[in-house]
C-alpha cells in the first residue's frame, strides 16, 4: 500500500537482526516498526544499519531490549501493539511531507502477539490499507493498495 509519497513495506519475515538489516539498507527515510519476541541475538545487525532510519517504533516483549540497543543511535518510541506503532510511524512520515517508507522488519519472532509472521504481516497490510485510505482525499497523492 502507499499513500502519496509514503510507501508501506511488509517484511514481517525479517525475524532476526541480519534480515532486518538487509531491509533497512534497501530503503531511504525509513520509519521502522520493530519488535516482538526477541531472538538470541536481540536486535543484532540491525543496530548497525540505521543510516536511513528516521525513527524506530517498537512493539512486543522485546521493546525494552531493543530500546536499549537503539539508545543514542536513532529515535525510538514504545507502542502497545502493531496498530499503534504503524499509525504513529505513518503520522510521522506523513508530517514529513517527503518520500518515506513505513517498514515492518521486526528483527524478532511474532509469537508474543501473533500466530505467525504471516499473521503479523497480514495485520500490517490491513492497517496500512486503512491508513492510506484515510488520506486519499487530502490532495497529497492518492492511495494505492
Where on the chain are the PLM-derived regions?
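ATP-dependent carboxylate-amine ligase
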Residues: 2-145
Amino acid at each position: 500500500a502507499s499513500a502519496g509519497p509514503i510507501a508501506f513495506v511488509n517484511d514481517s519475515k525479517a525475524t532476526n537482526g541480519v534480515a532486518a538489516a538487509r531491509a533497512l539498507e534497501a530503503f531511504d527515510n525509513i520509519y521502522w516498526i520493530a519488535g516482538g519476541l526477541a531472538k538470541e541475538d536481540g536486535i543484532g545487525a540491525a543496530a548497525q544499519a540505521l543510516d536511513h532510519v528516521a525513527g524506530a517504533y517498537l512493539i512486543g516483549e522485546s521493546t525494552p531490549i531493543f530500546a536499549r540497543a537503539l539508545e543514542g543511535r536513532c529515535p525510538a518510541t514504545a507502542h502497545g501493539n502493531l496498530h499503534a506503532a504503524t499509525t504513529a510511524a505513518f503520522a510521522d512520515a506523513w508530517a514529513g511531507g517527503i518520500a518515506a517508507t513505513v517498514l515492518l522488519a521486526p528483527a524478532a519472532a511474532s509469537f508474543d502477539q501473533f500466530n505467525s509472521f504471516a499473521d503479523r504481516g497480514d495485520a500490517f497490510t490491513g492497517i496500512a490499507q486503512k491508513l492510506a485510505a484515510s488520506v486519499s482525499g487530502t490532495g497529497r497523492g492518492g492511495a494505492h493498495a
